[in-house]
Amino acid sequence: MNVNLEKKYKNTIVKELFKEQRFQSIMQVPVVKKIVVNMGAGDATQNSKVIEDITNELALITGLRPVVTKAKDSIASFKLREGMPIGAKVTLRGKKMYQFLDKLINIALPRVRDFRGLNKDAFDGRGNYTLGIKEQIIFPEIDYDKVKRVRGMDITIVTSATNDADARALLRKMGMPFKK
């Protein structure tokens, strides 16, 4: 696994983006600020053990202890009360962020069944990219035999880019496999 994604960014990607995107200063070149990995569990209202499973899996995948997310409002039709645990999330920054991004690009995404590339239109208009993964078993840390239920997750990559074009160029240079 290439752990030097951060070095690659600092040594080559910054210079290439500076020339291509016509920035006035090298400090305007976008950088990945943080990555937020979120797993929701709708069945956590009936079974409290589900949250424990999710937090363990997220901890294995990211290397950090997740924060349990709780419901903001009560919804009677979902048998949900305010304050009930309904998921978990991890915010990655620094070295762990670059390691996770490298693992996502080079190991996890190629293991997705029928993978034809990421949607290049999933940017939010402010330079952030969100992708959904249907199975947590694409990550090498997860043992398929120990998984009780296959769950998906949301991964949000927050960049300092002010528009989608700059963020797309940054992520493409980092190796994100976007659809053509």
From Swiss-Prot:
GO biological process: translation
Annotated GO CC locations: ribonucleoprotein complex; ribosome
Keyword Phosphoprotein appears in the UniProt entry: no
Cross-referenced InterPro entries: Ribosomal_uL5, Ribosomal_uL5_bac-type, Ribosomal_uL5_C, Ribosomal_uL5_dom_sf, Ribosomal_uL5_N
Stated family: Belongs to the universal ribosomal protein uL5 family.
Function statement: This is one of the proteins that bind and probably mediate the attachment of the 5S RNA into the large ribosomal subunit, where it forms part of the central protuberance. In the 70S ribosome it contacts protein S13 of the 30S subunit (bridge B1b), connecting the 2 subunits; this bridge is implicated in subunit movement. Contacts the P site tRNA; the 5S rRNA and some of its associated proteins might help stabilize positioning of ribosome-bound tRNAs.
Quaternary context: Part of the 50S ribosomal subunit; part of the 5S rRNA/L5/L18/L25 subcomplex. Contacts the 5S rRNA and the P site tRNA. Forms a bridge to the 30S subunit in the 70S ribosome.
Name of the protein: Large ribosomal subunit protein uL5
Organism: Spiroplasma kunkelii
Upper classification of the organism: Bacteria, Bacillati, Mycoplasmatota, Mollicutes, Entomoplasmatales
Gene name of the record: rplE
